[in-house]
């Protein structure tokens, strides 16, 4: 069983056009710094973030550029999942997405939540 204080699941629905996408990854990275194992599940417009070049120009001062936040998240071992139906609805395939993204259903987060993971939604 997962220790509830050690796992965090962040569910994102906002894309590159909304500041909450940058806020979510800032908080996810902060969770990792605090010692949490963090997973981000992208759904709806958030799936567009991880399309290659999908977040190149998204900067919300004073936060780091979104592309840097996501790269840091992945480099530090964060798990990044893109909702299967949302990816398919947009006509994307795995090779359309940045490296490190896994196309997955919501069962990935349900397993963690059932085991006691904390959740945040943006």
Give the location of each predicted region:
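N-terminal beta-loop-helix "entrance" segment that forms/cooperates
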Residues: 46-60
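Short, flexible loop segments at the rims of nucleotide/cofactor-binding pockets, characterized by
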Residues: 56-61, 96-100
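Anion (oxyanion) recognition and catalysis
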Residues: 32, 74, 113-114
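Short internal beta-strands
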Residues: 38-44, 80-84
């Amino acid at each position: 069983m997962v220790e509830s204080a050690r796992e965090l699941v962040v569910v994102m629905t906002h894309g590159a056009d909304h500041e909450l996408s940058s806020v979510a990854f800032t908080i996810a990275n902060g969770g990792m710094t605090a010692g949490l194992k963090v997973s981000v599940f992208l759904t709806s417009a958030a799936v567009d973030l991880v399309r290659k070049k999908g977040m190149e120009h998204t900067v919300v001062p004073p936060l780091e550029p979104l592309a840097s936040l996501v790269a840091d998240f992945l480099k530090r071992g964060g798990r990044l999942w893109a909702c299967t139906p949302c990816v398919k609805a947009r006509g994307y395939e795995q090779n359309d997405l940045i490296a490190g993204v896994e196309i997955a259903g919501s069962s990935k987060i349900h397993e963690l939540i059932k085991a006691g993971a904390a959740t945040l939604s943006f």
